[in-house]
Amino acid sequence: MRDRRGSLGTCLAQVQQARGGDSNKLSYSLKKRMPMEGLWPADAPSWMNKPVVDGNSQSEALSLEMRKDPSGAGPWLHGGGPVLPYVKESVRRNPASAATRSTAVGLLPAPTECFAQVACSGVEALERDWLGGGARATDGHRGQCPKGEPRVSRLLCHQKLPEMGSFQDDPPNALPKGLGSELEPSCLHSVLSATLHACPEVLLNDETKRVFLDRLKPMFSKQTMEFKKMLKNTSDGLQITLGLLALQPFELANSLCHS
């Protein structure tokens, strides 16, 4: 996970091979379904191509949508609660369709415990060390989001990724450290791969896939210097960084599915 030359893409390929799958099948299938243009860094998997979208208004609307949660419950709940309720309901309604689509793009479902482990480890650590008033917290990061909002929505509010693609205040130091073995690489890869498996309605839909991928653009853009600096300076916490990135697409997909 600490090989900066291609850690994310390399590990995803290793997971595909370990499960008996073709490491090129995912990128090939998705390139056929999502032809897009643009340059992405070597660390980004080949299926995360940057879409050409003039989406300022879309981003603003989506940002507002992501902050709305009438139920008051986030996608990830502690104590054995539901993890992404939409996924379970979607599979229950049409299991054959979901299985067919996921097989078509060479994906395997992730166990529920993988979602829970990544979510709990990343979000709790970030709240404790950054938003919760710890040593790395700053005055500008406290009390800006209502307590009733979902955990990950609160993180997105503070990170301001839609506007700037990175953390404005102390990007490297704001990340929590010391999770170590709590966040296993296999769990992270399962979550990243399962984004496509769990939400085919979003990622294979011409309208929503562009919004979804456009929101990932700041996290992998070559032009986002602060984000590159953040990755460079957190080699000990690279799994944490990638884990937080995995959380954000899931909340976005969940929001789009309910919009």
From Swiss-Prot:
Main location as per UniProt: nucleus
Keywords from the named record: Cytoplasm, Cytoplasmic vesicle, Nucleus
InterPro entries, per database record: FAM220A, SIPAR
Coiled-coil residue spans: none
Subcellular location: Nucleus; Cytoplasm; Cytoplasmic vesicle, Secretory vesicle, Acrosome
GO molecular-function term, one example from the UniProt record: STAT family protein binding
GO cellular component terms attached to this protein's record: acrosomal vesicle; nucleus
Superkingdom, taxonomy of origin: Eukaryota
GO biological process: negative regulation of transcription by RNA polymerase II
Pfam family, one: FAM220
Its job: Promotes dephosphorylation of transcriptional activator STAT3 by interacting with both STAT3 and protein phosphatase PTPN2. This promotes interaction of PTPN2 with STAT3 and mediates STAT3 dephosphorylation by PTPN2, leading to negative regulation of STAT3 transcriptional activator activity. May be required for spermiogenesis or sperm function.
Record text on subunit structure and interactions: Interacts with transcriptional activator STAT3; the interaction occurs in both the nucleus and the cytoplasm, is enhanced by IL6 and promotes STAT3 dephosphorylation, leading to negative regulation of STAT3 transcriptional activator activity. Can interact with both unphosphorylated and phosphorylated STAT3 but interacts preferentially with phosphorylated STAT3 in the nucleus. Interacts with protein phosphatase PTPN2/TC45; this promotes interaction of PTPN2 with STAT3, leading to dephosphorylation of STAT3 by PTPN2.
Protein name: Protein FAM220A
Species of the source: Macaca fascicularis (Crab-eating macaque)
